[in-house]
Amino acid sequence: MRTLWIVTVLLVGVEGSLVELGKMILQETGKNPLTSYGVYGCNCGVGGRHKPKDGTDRCCYVHKCCYKKMTDCDPKKDRYSYSWKDKTIVCDENNPCLKELCECDKAVAICLRENLDTYNKKYKIYPKFFCKKAEPC
């Protein structure tokens, strides 16, 4: 469990319900969140939003934009719960803010699965200083 915590911290900084996000990514992609996405491209992991290198990196960019658009909750502190039913992520929250946070994390996990064919090992540990600023969300 401690490894999963470290994995998710590296994946998205200290934002969101980190343990849940890591589980979602593992469930959807079958990949270890830390070793596969921890410092992937220009947007996965800690740091600002940059021009995505590929579809996988774009998923992380869109995820950061999703967090940025939240107004009624704090993705850095708030925690949610979800369930995995019939290989589908179900956000179980009644609280609208926590449900929105869960849906942002669900969307990135599904996006990463849908973009497994764009995953490029050359971006697996990509130096952020090669990244260019992206358009605003």
From Swiss-Prot:
Residues 121-133 are annotated as: Important for membrane-damaging activities in eukaryotes and bacteria. InterPro entries: PLipase_A2, PLipase_A2_Asp_AS, PLipase_A2_dom, PLipase_A2_dom_sf, PLipase_A2_His_AS. One of its GO terms (biological process) is negative regulation of T cell proliferation. SMART domains: PA2c. Expressed by the venom gland. Residues 1-16 form the signal peptide. Keywords: Disulfide bond, Myotoxin, Secreted, Signal, Toxin. The record marks K121, K124 as: Important residue of the cationic membrane-docking site (MDoS). The record marks K128, K133 as: Cationic membrane-docking site (MDoS). One of its GO terms (cellular component) is extracellular region. GO terms for molecular function: calcium ion binding; calcium-dependent phospholipase A2 activity; phospholipid binding; toxin activity. CDD domains: PLA2c. Disulfide bonds join C42-C131, C44-C60, C59-C111, C65-C137, C66-C104, C73-C97, C91-C102. It is found in: Secreted. Homodimer; non-covalently linked. Snake venom phospholipase A2 homolog that lacks enzymatic activity. Is myotoxic and displays edema-inducing activities. A model of myotoxic mechanism has been proposed: an apo Lys49-PLA2 is activated by the entrance of a hydrophobic molecule (e.g. fatty acid) at the hydrophobic channel of the protein leading to a reorientation of a monomer. Belongs to the phospholipase A2 family. Group II subfamily. K49 sub-subfamily. This is Basic phospholipase A2 homolog 4a.
